[in-house]
Amino acid sequence: MCRCPLEHHEVRMTSAEAIAVAGSAQEHGRPKWPPDKPQVLGQPALARVVVAALVWLLAGASMSSLNKWIFTVHGFGRPLLLSALHMLAAAVACHWGAQRPVPHSIHRRVLLLSLTFGTSMACGNVGLSTVPLDLAQLATTTTPLFTLALSALLLGRRHHPLQFAAMGPLCLGAACSLAGELRAPPAGCGFLLVATCLRGFKSVQQSALLQEERLDAVTLLYATSLPSFCLLAGAALVLEAGAAPPLPPTDSRLWACVLLSCFLSVVYNLASFSLLALTSALTVHVLGNLTVVGNLILSRLLFGSHLSALSYVGIALTLSGMFLYHNCESVASWATRRGLWNRDQPGKGL
């Protein structure tokens, strides 16, 4: 986990974003970099972050592979319907767990999040149904770049300079991986690109509602799941009613996979919301790049996918960018000891 300075949000951290510092710096407008006394995440909060991250990574990798299995092996040609079922499962699961109603003052923000949530999920599943699993996962590695830009533009958050540097290998690695897998349909790649952009926007919205408005993960997921379900169910009814082949009602294996996919979706979304409440939108998506390796292995084992040499170079670059992002303070300290980085003069550095 990155040890960059953290925001004063009780036990919550903004990971490597360091958007707030102590009083005197606030009087002069934008906070200085770096803060004098960075906060350290307490052991209980750190344990919650680790558990939520592990659950999120495992559920995400399993759900992506299972969804691809449903689309490919069972011929389930209804990605919008599957997305709607995911949202319905979230609404049912969170109905009794929501702690309090959403304040009326933020209803519009919640509805906007629901629209972004549902659209990103639909585009992701539509893209996944048409392209190989490995390519679908590699496309998501550019999400941290969109999240970094949106958090700076929309929320005014400041980032460690090395975090911007880490976006280079992260996105270059994704570009190399995509260049090595150009056999995929252009339409599927387009849906994946839209889903990636919307996923970054969604995380910024979630982070603001969870941390600034103090909503809990279950309440926010419940509030967004019902509007998202209505949106996705309507889209599935209009776009997939006559286009996809009829569903086999007696295929017990298919419906068992669909139910398991819905369960994994609920677990994944709850863990994602919890991570956003404890860390930040950018940290979550950089962590999400870890699922790429797991899904590449599963894609090779389950579907016989093979990556080119350029794609493996892209994976190595992506992992190096992740290392730089999560260890920006350690890298900066190492460079400072060798005279390559001057903390007091941000203009002079690596």
From Swiss-Prot:
Membrane topology term: Multi-pass membrane protein
Pfam families, A to Z: TPT
Alphabetical UniProt keywords: Membrane, Transmembrane, Transmembrane helix
Transit peptide keyword on record: no
Principal place of residence: membrane
Superkingdom in the source lineage: Eukaryota
UniProt GO cellular component terms: Golgi apparatus; membrane
Residue stretches spanning the membrane: 40-60, 79-99, 110-130, 135-155, 218-238, 258-278, 279-299, 301-321
Location(s) in or outside the cell: Membrane
Domain EamA: 125-179
One BP term from GO: transmembrane transport
An annotated Gene Ontology molecular function: antiporter activity
Family: Belongs to the TPT transporter family. SLC35E subfamily.
PANTHER family tied to this protein: SOLUTE CARRIER FAMILY 35 (PTHR11132)
Function: Putative transporter.
Record's protein name: Solute carrier family 35 member E4
Originating species: Rattus norvegicus
Gene name of the encoded protein: Slc35e4
